[in-house]
Amino acid sequence: MATIGPSGLHPGERASVCPHEGVPRPSGSLELECLQQFKVTRTQLQQIQASLLCSMEQALKGQDSPAPSVRMLPTYVRSTPHGTEQGDFLVLELGATGASLRVLWVTLTGTKECRVEPRSREFVIPQEVILGAGQQLFDFAARCLSEFLDAYPVENQGLKLGFNFSFPCHQTGLDRSTLISWTKGFRCSGVEGQDVVQLLRDAIQRQGTYRIDVVAMVNDTVGTMMGCELGTRPCEVGLIVDTGTNACYMEEARHVAALDEDRGRTCVSIEWGSFYDEDALGPVLTTFDSALDRESLTPGAQRFEKMIGGLYLGELVRLVLVHLTQHGVLFDGCASPALLSQGCILLDHVAEMEDTATGTARVHTILQDLGLSPRASDAELVQYVCVAVCTRAAQLCAAALAAVLSRLQHSREQQTLQVAVATGGRVFERHPRFLRILKETVTLLAPNCDVSFIPSVDGGGRGVAMVTAVAARLAAHRRILEETLAPFQLTLEQMTVVQAQMREAMIRGLQGEASSLRMLPTYVRATPDGSERGDFLALDLGGTNFRVLLVRVAEGSVQIINQVYSIPECRAQGSGQKLFDHIVDCIVDFQKRQGLSGQSLPLGFTFSFPCKQLGLDQGILLNWTKGFNASGCEGQDVVYLLREAIRRRQAVELNVVAIVNDTVGTMMSCGYDDPRCEMGLIVGTGTNACYMEELRNVASVPGDSGLMCINMEWGAFGDDGSLGTLSTRFDTSVDQASINPGKQRFEKMISGMYLGEIVRHILLHLTNLGVLFRGQKTQCLQARDIFKTKFLSEIESDSLALRQVRAILEDLGLTLTSDDALMVLEVCQAVSRRAAQLCGAGVAAVVEKIRENRGLQELTVSVGVDGTLYKLHPHFSKLVSATVRKLAPQCTVTFLQSEDGSGKGAALVTAVACRLTQMAHV
């Protein structure tokens, strides 16, 4: 018997509910009018979908709906299974299968290959218990637990129990849940408004036979989702159609107002059985729905559930049959006493009468058992009624599911949602056609959702055990993560120690004593005061591209014109003479372009290679880096080499005034706009700082008055072992794998070249412990420098949906869950926070030194900053500033981001030098 589903319907068209080929459609006007009520158009389904989605979003926001709505209850289940969960768990299932209670012993092995079937036993709940006092019900449950365990050698071990309680509850924790209202025929007094977990614990204690700890309260819908077999796509929706109906799904926690959280996901139980909207559901309600509702235990409540749930489908069929019989259409108008009795047609009867394999034979048998004498045409019409009622139920269920899928697609901002839906309940088990119609209707209503439906494996048993196991796994993984990241959480005391150590190293370095800080004089003796004027040239050499700049300093403005020139490999690795001749050629070309030929402008040279300065215009190249290896340069004064190249190029006059490193250039660039800027800070690929020191404190330069800019070279701070207590196993791994083990230890804990590597080593460690990526070791994480520091900035800049985290890690070939994404974010935050705090401790040491040098109670000072990590990371600058405020409360520090420190800064160093020279002449 092939069902014609809703595929291909146009707006306003109705889905066919023909039971099977060969069965005549009802021809009488009464039966047609009767069954026409159960037909639903696509437009009506779309209206239900939209209305339910609106109710869901209102409930998530905590807004009251004008009509009875869905509840959207957080279940505090925060993760779906990984497949590695293991252990023994006890499960108590109440309310999932009508008037019965089930106890299970579930063993999870952590592997698909070695699966242990759960042991279970079902207990029938007497009707007087279902309608009696609440304590009586929970005492009955405790007795059933004891009776079940009596059959097994449990001894006196503590047992972990998951409680599957399939009624609307308000959960405030995984093991705290208050019953909102009874459904499914239960009406035990004294339970609504009470914590059912505590009621069960009290009953178990009264029983006193076994030590049982109730650790999780789960409804059958959540258990269905959690009990789903792991497939190729995440199972993040659970759908139950049993005696009642409900759905749950994994929602972004930030959207659940009741949680007040902004990270991760949580499973939300929709409780859609209570959904009702007159505009959406009113047009599809029949007279039979109204009659069923009036006769129910809960008139006016659970209206949506009463159109779908298995507890009601048989009763709807009975009401239709009674109506047709009373009008003489069926059974010659003779209704038996049984047919007139509420509840005589059950879900199983409807399923059997729909079964295509038995034809109408089983219909005859069931009707005869009800005291009826059906003709062949009666059996066919009864079968048609069953199909009409169940088809509508499947279509309404599909409209509700489509609303959930739309919600998921929207909240995840995905063009096409790929998701698995776990299905459970006897309606799915007994009605194969129900699932087919559901699938077809979902495809029609949610065309951009690629959905696979997976039957849940004992959601009430294994699924509830899985919730308990997942909670245990998350708790264990959380402990490991916190232990791993604990060394990165610097205390105020630790930061104060770093500040003091930095201060001590500064003093020793200035006095020429052994120190990890070089404290090199730069021969820059003043910062800009705003009176600088004129045109200056600047050169910027630090890589394969070389810049020549014209910097015009006027009152209140600095204009920059620059030209980029490439340095061919043959020049970078050839003779030094040819390299500097090429540089001069570029300068001459720039002068021609700017109409400066023949002019001798003061020139500042930013030379970003290791140098020892002997004067403002003297710098000895210690060694080439960054792919340069020009011969005859190391150990030579690079300003002299430049001047010699100028001399060789006749008719060119250039006045080389200063050689500058990028840190000093940064300070000077900001100093023009803010005269209080007396410190420069670089936090990029590397890190360094400079500041204006009292000349009397600089042992290597004669003089007792005035200032001197000191290049700290603070990346080497801690090379004497002073940072050993802060160094982690991951820092050690990064250091040992570097090209300079044991060197630049401070830089390796702060700068952009190394933070990504620290994160990579932490991720490897957590993966090896099974905390990340399900413990699956991947080759990509083994590769050095695969995790770029820019990833930290992108990950920590991410929106709350963690899309960037997923994209970055998936591009690296890693398969991750939502939990993995959150943990990677936490790792990045811990590493970058420590880096910023260490940097802040260094800045605090410097500004405190400046304050005490001048004998001030309070100091107001600015710091010029440059570097990609500082500028691009979303939180680094704020963390540095906050740390300085804590460690140097007597200093008011303003951080200024530098603009072109290597160009503008070099020109301003030159401008200040010219100003000082002119003042000296005067």
Curated annotation (Swiss-Prot):
Region (Disordered): 1-23
Segments for region (Hexokinase large subdomain 1): 219-458
Sorted UniProt keywords: Allosteric enzyme, ATP-binding, Glycolysis, Kinase, Nucleotide-binding, Repeat, Transferase
Keyword Repeat: yes
Residues that, per the record, bind D-glucose 1: 166, 183-184, 219-220, 246, 271, 302-305
EC class name: transferase
Protein residues bound to D-glucose 2: 608-609, 625-626, 661-662, 687-688, 713, 747
Pfam families reported in the protein's UniProt record: Hexokinase_1 (PF00349), Hexokinase_2 (PF03727)
Alphabetized GO MF terms: ATP binding; D-glucose binding; fructokinase activity; glucokinase activity; hexokinase activity
Binding site for D-glucose 6-phosphate 1: 93-102, 220, 243, 424-426
Positions contributing to ATP 2 binding: 540-545, 685, 752-753, 789-793, 868-872
PROSITE patterns: HEXOKINASE_1 (PS00378), HEXOKINASE_2 (PS51748)
Organism superkingdom: Eukaryota
UniProt-listed Enzyme Commission number(s): 2.7.1.1
Matching InterPro entries: ATPase_NBD, Hexokinase, Hexokinase_BS, Hexokinase_C, Hexokinase_N
Chain ranges of the Hexokinase domain: 25-469, 475-911
Biological or metabolic pathway of the protein: Carbohydrate metabolism; hexose metabolism; Carbohydrate degradation; glycolysis; D-glyceraldehyde 3-phosphate and glycerone phosphate from D-glucose: step 1/4
Database matches in Gene3D superfamilies: 3.30.420.40, 3.40.367.20
Residues where ATP 1 binds: 93-100, 436-437
Protein name (database record): Hexokinase-3
Organism of derivation: Mus musculus
